[in-house]
Amino acid sequence: MIIDIHSHCYKNPLPFVTPFCNPEELIKFNDKEGIDKAVLLPVVNSEIYFPQSNDEILEICAAYPDRFIPYCNIDPRAMTNSSNAPLHKVLEYYKNKGCKGIGEVMPNMELMDPKVQNLFRAAEEVGLPLVYDGSDVKDGDFGLYDDPGLSQLEHTLQRFPKLKIFGHGPVFWAELFRLQTPGERGYIWNFDGSDQVGVRGEESVVEGVVPILLRRYENLHCDLSDSTPLQALSRNMEYTKKFFIEFQDRLYFGTDMCNKYVDFPHVRFIKQLLTDGVITKEIYDKVTHKNAIKLLGL
């Protein structure tokens, strides 16, 4: 069994930014890949994609209850655009409607912004896990900004010890190994939005901040979706083996399906780790579905 902890779709995708799947297209993709169920994360922040409602996600999941699991989401600026907005009321409302988590949170704000911290506080109060995407710039991007070394994430983990926070995306996974320069944390594009600018140097294999944070804070979990964890975990298979052994109970398979025309090698990657003996069958089962079943109460 495979559960995708991080996926997206729209009932009626718009022809802008990226070609998302509709529900039927996502089911077809999942069938091809051997994915049994997928968590659907509503996009509510307008920094890059067009916002969708939590109710759209609930309607999709109600139509295909055996294939999709709903999350809810809310922009931290919603309701009163302040650090005391009663966001917990919204989260409680959608939790009662069946939503199993929160995300993908990705406004281009600082992680320690009081309004963002208010959202995390509400998530902890309601008792739902939260996944966010990060950024290494404070404007012109999507995702919560953090400093090199992920100090804002660490302070958030300290402040909300009962909140399960999922690390995800380039800024998080760039720090699996020690950075050579802060610019390695993210991607910068040409003004026309085409090719990526710059060339990265030799890849480090010295342990970075992420495993240190995982050892310090049991409320930090890892979302293995998008290409960045696959790239990082392909650098040194000896280290990858140790990483999966040590953190096997907090790693979750995911794809971050947000372009129906792109190849997603995630199932092949995790199966190859099993075939090559990098991970055991027990770890494979945990990462592909057992951890998600436990987390979401399925």
Q: In which residue ranges do the predicted regions lie?
A:
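Mid-to-C-terminal alpha-helical segments outside catalytic/metal-binding sites
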Residues: 1-37, 245-252, 258-298
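Mobile, glycine- and charge-enriched loop segments
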Residues: 1-19, 53-83, 210, 218-221
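Hydrophobic faces of well-ordered beta-strands that scaffold small-molecule active sites
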Residues: 3-7, 38-40, 69-72, 102-104, ...
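Catalytic pocket-lining loop regions of alpha/beta-barrel enzymes
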Residues: 113-253
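Conserved, mostly hydrophobic/aromatic
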Residues: 6, 30, 57, 61, ...
